[in-house]
Each structure stands twice: as structure tokens, then as C-alpha cells.
Swiss-Prot record:
GO terms for molecular function: metal ion binding; metallopeptidase activity. It is found in: Cytoplasm; Nucleus. Keywords: Cytoplasm, Hydrolase, Metal-binding, Metalloprotease, Nucleus, Protease. SUPFAM superfamilies: Creatinase/aminopeptidase (SSF55920). This is Probable metalloprotease ARX1. One of its GO terms (biological process) is ribosomal large subunit export from nucleus. Probable metalloprotease involved in proper assembly of pre-ribosomal particles during the biogenesis of the 60S ribosomal subunit. Accompanies the pre-60S particles to the cytoplasm. Component of the nucleoplasmic and cytoplasmic pre-60S ribosomal particles. GO terms for cellular component: cytoplasm; nucleolus; nucleoplasm; preribosome, large subunit precursor. Belongs to the peptidase M24 family. It comes from Eremothecium gossypii (strain ATCC 10895 / CBS 109.51 / FGSC 9923 / NRRL Y-1056).
Length: 591
């Protein structure tokens, strides 16, 4: 069932409401301030629990998520109290460890279930220990932790993701303070470095859309296009012996359309660069001599729904908002293979690997295109609460009366008690597709020799309906004829891969809404709160690559305050938050 919207309403919702007036920029800026303040708050809680060790018992991942969401909710309620119809959490706090790519935001009552579901699981001896931290509920030394927070004011969304490292600590002789024992080394450090540099490079590249005459000649382009964005990110990943994980994106965001329902909602006039398995397949075939006669698809044969299919054929223009969300995985000491995502569920008895993680999704998103009369009273009550949360993902804990929690004395028992009642109605709501669960996903590498030896007798059109994909990318490997169901069956021969993630939201502000009277790029998130962790990579940018030469020129332009790129950062609120929020030596400049 699809929503019928008139052309007049479409003009208002997709065009008029997305013009960057001063009032809209203020809402974007406020959402960015709240998001960055919340990220600083979350980083402080982690530092106090796992670095400074000022707490007798460290906070669990579920408690960290809940306290941060409560902090965001309290801040949002203070902003635009009488000027915005809707405001709240746009992305519940997720804390993804190592190979867990996205979606890990456990409820407070999941700890006992995680141990029960995974009691027969065999521990993984490799460097990826995300499953270990997920089952125990606590972070461990050496974990690469991806923190994601987001909020919105009247549908104008700001989101940030930052990769943080949990270091082993030692006492400093001068003052006996706990400090990191040393930088992060190895493959994980390569991924963190590549993600950070790629994020900053794309930010500077988008700023060139405001002044195309400053676009480096090494790129061979006169406009900032989707193709150029992909070339820049791929060049950085190659230099650090890494690859871009499927699900990464640099896309335009609009009011209430921030990419939170990709694969479920076919967004009209979508603009963005998306990385999928099909792009890895194309790169493999392009590097093979035997594939010079690959049939190419004529782009002129467009269907009626092509506006919902994301392609690189677009130009970045002033007056738009963009989400830069990059996930990078290292390839060091790994065979050549395909990076793909594995969806986690809590069903046992499957004939899969013995080290597979079992867990249930926590993020829920209402689908307003579906209507159904529910039978259970608890289901109807839950649906009413979900309707009040709008189109953004939420958690059952956010629907309890105890939310938001008091950070000084949180009532965890009250939340757990209400969760039992809410779970009774969740099954009927999701079974009738009134709400969609956003899955927990792991990054896995399937060797190419396994894929090339696989047969697909059911045909390449056997799609996996349980995992929605972007329109136009239903077949993960179209040229090799591998369907999503067949690729899913090959995951039993895959390897876990750690992931680093960096994401920010930026505005391309026209001259009419800036204080300087000239166009500028406004970083809503990703300012001083996303300082890179202390790492050391064995790789560096390949200066012989023309694209890398352009990237280095972009870096110089971003530093030139007078003649370079006009980039302004949104600062977090200077309000008093717990002392845990101070950034310590665990977040120092990259070595």
C-alpha cells in the first residue's frame, strides 16, 4: 500500500520546506549542537567507565545508550518549545563494536537473553571481538567502538558517528594518572585513519560546490558530481589497504528524509552515492582482462521509477544538506573477497557457523503506509505510542513512562518492568508490517573463490524479502548471477572484518543565510567532538595517484582561512554536563 500525495503537497514537502531559510538553518544548527553535545557526553561516560575508571562498576552498553538518549531527549525538549511541531531523537544511540556495523542498541533487559541465546557459541580467536562485547554487555580493551547519535528539530536532522578506541591504560609516573598504554596499531588503525581522512576529504569536496573555481584540476572535473565523490572515497580506501563497506553513503537529506528508511521507503528524486556489493563486483570484473566485452546497460532506457533509484549521475548544488556516512573495513591479512553485511537474529538451531552471534533488533520504525486493525489491547497501545514518535526509529525503552531517565539516579527497574508489557504487543505490530525492525548487521568477507565456484540454480532473481534493499540494487551481484538468497547461504564460509565509521551532516548555505554574506559550508556535526583517536597506521596516501593529489590540494584549501574554502563548524553547547564528558588523552590527534 502506497501513500497517495497530491502534486501540490509534493511541491510543499519536497521543495518548499527544504529551502534553506534562516529559520530552517537555525533548526538544523540547533539539532547539530544537541547531537555534538550528546556525543561529548557519551564519550565522557565511556572514558569514566573504561579509561579513568572512576566508577566502581563500569556502565554497560545498554546503560550507555539509555543515558545518552535521555540526555538528548531532555535537550530537545528545551529547544524550539513553541516553534516546532515535532522534535526528538532521530537516531537512537548505537554503540557498535568491531565487526558490528550498525544497529547495536540493546535494551536494558537484553543481558540475560544474550547469555542464554549464545550459551553454545564458540568464541572467535581473531581480532574481531564485537560478539564478545555484545554478549557480555560491556566494552573491552582493544575494542573499536562506533558511536552514533542523531536528533531532529521539526524534521531537520543532524546525525554524527565517531569511532573511538578503548585503550589499555597505564599509570603515568608524573602524576599517577591513567593514560593509554600506546596507540592503536594494525588493521583496525588503517580503517580508522582511512575513515577519518575520507570524511574530511568529502567535506572539503562538497565545499567546492559553493566555489567550483577552487576545485583542484587534478580531479579533471568542473563540478562536484556523484562520480567524483565515489572516486575520492575509493582512492583513500585503496591507499590504506581498505575497502568501503556496503551501506556507506554520501546522500542529500531533506526534511523528515534523512535516510532512516532506506530500502523501505522509495524516496523520490533521491540524490546520493551509495556503496553496494555490485560496485565491488564491477571493480573485480574491470580488473580482469577477460571481461573487456562485458555488456553495458544503456542509461537512456529509464523507467518511470528511476527517480527513486540512486545513481552517481547528479551534481551537488548550493542550498542542499548532505549526510556523509562512511564505513571502512581493512583488508590486511585477508584473502581477496566480497565485503557484505550479515543480518543478526535471535533464532537458534540454524545450520550456520558455531561462532555466529544471536541477538534481536532493538530499533523500530513505524511504517505509516500500512494500516491494520489490531486485536490485542497492548498492541493498540504500542501502535499509538509509535505513531507519536513519527517517521524516525525509536526503541521500546523510549516509550516507557520513566523515559527520559535522571542521570544521577536512573530507575532501571521501572524501565525493565514496562518493557515486558510493551513486548507483548510488539509481535502483532511487526507481524502486520505496521512497524519495521532495523536489523543489527555484521561485516563479513566472502572469498571470491567461494563465490565464483557457487552455483545458483534458482536464478539471480531470488531476493531476500526479510532484508530490504535500495531500489535498483535488489540483486547484489547481477553480472555474476548471484542472488541475495544465494549470497546469504555463502556467509557460512565468510570471515568477520572490523569496521570504522565516521559520519557528519553538512549544509551548503547560500549567501543569503550566512553572517559573512558569502556562501559557506556549515558542519552541523563533526567538529571538535570527533577528534581522531590515537592510532598509528603503516600506510599513507599514495601521492602518485592523481585523485590523491587533488585530495591533498583540498586539505590545503580547507586550512586557508582567507583564500581557501569557506567552512564553518557548529560548536556543542557550553552547558554544564557531568565531569565524565571531558575528552581525555584517549581522544588525541592521530599520530
Amino acid at each position: 500500500m502506497a501513500l497517495a500525495i497530491s502534486s501540490e503537497d509534493t511541491q510543499v514537502l519536497l521543495k518548499d520546506k527544504n529551502v534553506l531559510h534562516e529559520s530552517n538553518v537555525d533548526k538544523y544548527r540547533t539539532a547539530g549542537q544537541i547531537t555534538q553535545t550528546a556525543l561529548r557526553f557519551l564519550a565522557g561516560l565511556i572514558n569514566d567507565s573504561y579509561h579513568h575508571r572512576t566508577r566502581a562498576t563500569p556502565l554497560s552498553v545498554a546503560e550507555l545508550c539509555m543515558l545518552t538518549d535521555s540526555f538528548v531527549e531532555r535537550c530537545v525538549r528545551q529547544a524550539f518549545a513553541n516553534k516546532a511541531n515535532e522534535r526528538g531523537i532521530a537516531h537512537p544511540t548505537t554503540i557498535d563494536v568491531d565487526e558490528i556495523t550498525q544497529g547495536w542498541a540493546p535494551e536494558t533487559d537484553d543481558a540475560a537473553n544474550m547469555e542464554r541465546w549464545n550459551r553454545d557459541r564458540q568464541a572467535n580467536s581473531g581480532s574481531c571481538q564485537g560478539a564478545r562485547s555484545a554478549i557480555s554487555g560491556f566494552l573491552h580493551e582493544g575494542d573499536v567502538v562506533k558511536l552514533t547519535v542523531g536528533c531532529h528539530i521539526d524534521g531537520y536532522t543532524a546525525q554524527v558517528s565517531h569511532t573511538m578506541v578503548v585503550y589499555p591504560t597505564t599509570r603515568r609516573e608524573a602524576d599517577q594518572a591513567l593514560v593509554p598504554a600506546g596507540p592503536l596499531l594494525g588493521a583496525k588503525a588503517d580503517a580508522v585513519a582511512a575513515a577519518t581522512i575520507a570524511k574530511e576529504s568529502v567535506t572539503s569536496l562538497l565545499a567546492c560546490a559553493q566555489a567550483t573555481e577552487k576545485l583542484p584540476a587534478a580531479f579533471g572535473e568542473r563540478q562536484v558530481t556523484g562520480t567524483l565523490i565515489r572516486r575520492v572515497v575509493d582512492a583513500v580506501a585503496r591507499s590504506y589497504n581498505c575497502a568501503v563497506v556496503p551501506g556507506s553513503r554520501v546522500r542529500r537529506v531533506r526534511r523528515f528524509l534523512a535516510g532512516q528508511n532506506e530500502g523501505v521507503v522509495a524516496e523520490r528524486d533521491i540524490k546520493g552515492v551509495h556503496w553496494t556489493e555490485a560496485h565491488q563486483e564491477a571493480a573485480l570484473l574491470a580488473s580482469s582482462v577477460e571481461t573487456t566485452d562485458v555488456t553495458r546497460v544503456d542509461a537512456s532506457n529509464k523507467s518511470a521509477n528511476d527517480s527513486a533509484v540512486a545513481t552517481d549521475d547528479f551534481v551537488v548544488v548550493s542550498g542542499e544538506a548532505y549526510l556523509i556516512d562512511l564505513k571502512i573495513a581493512p583488508l590486511k591479512d585477508l584473502p581477496r573477497g566480497l565485503l557484505t553485511l550479515q543480518t543478526v537474529d535471535h533464532f537458534s538451531g540454524k545450520s550456520h557457523r558455531k561462532d555466529e552471534l544471536l541477538a534481536r533488533a532493538s530499533l523500530i520504525c513505524r511504517d505509516f503506509a500500512k494500516q491494520h486493525v489490531l486485536k490485542l489491547k497492548s498492541s493498540r497501545q504500542l501502535l499509538h505510542k509509535l505513531d507519536s514518535k513519527g517517521v524516525y526509529p525509536t526503541k521500546l525503552a523510549h516509550l516507557t513512562a520513566a523515559f527520559p531517565l535522571d542521570p544521577e539516579s536512573p530507575d532501571w527497574d521501572a524501565v525493565s518492568k514496562e518493557l515486558k508489557h510493551l513486548r507483548l504487543g510488539l509481535a502483532e505490530v511487526t507481524n502486520n508490517y505496521l512497524a519495521n525492525e532495523k536489523p543489527v548487521q555484521l561485516c563479513r568477507l566472502v572469498p571470491w573463490d567461494v563465490i565464483l565456484k557457487a552455483v545458483n540454480p534458482t536464478g539471480k532473481h531470488g531476493t531476500d524479502a526479510s532484508n530490504p534493499t535500495l531500489p535498483g540494487y535488489e540483486i547484489p551481484l547481477p553480472q555474476l548471477g548471484i542472488s541475495s538468497l544465494r549470497l546469504k547461504s555463502l556467509l557460512k564460509d565468510s570471515l568477520p572484518v572490523p569496521v570504522a565509521r565516521e559520519s557528519i551532516t553538512v549544509l551548503l548555505c547560500p549567501a543569503e543565510v550566512t553572517s559573512t554574506g558569502s556562501p559557506e559550508l556549515l558542519k552541523l556535526t563533526g567538529g571538535p567532538t570527533t577528534t581522531p583517536s590515537w592510532i598509528h597506521s603503516d600506510y599513507e596516501l599514495n601521492v602518485s595517484d592523481p585523485v590523491v593529489q587533488g585530495i591533498l590540494q583540498l586539505a590545503e584549501l580547507s586550512k586557508d582561512k582567507r583564500f581557501g574554502l569557506a567552512i564553518r563548524e557548529t560548536q556543542p553547547w557550553k552547558q554544564k554536563i557531568p565531569s565524565a564528558a571531558a575528552v581525555t588523552s584517549a581522544d588525541v590527534e592521530m599520530a
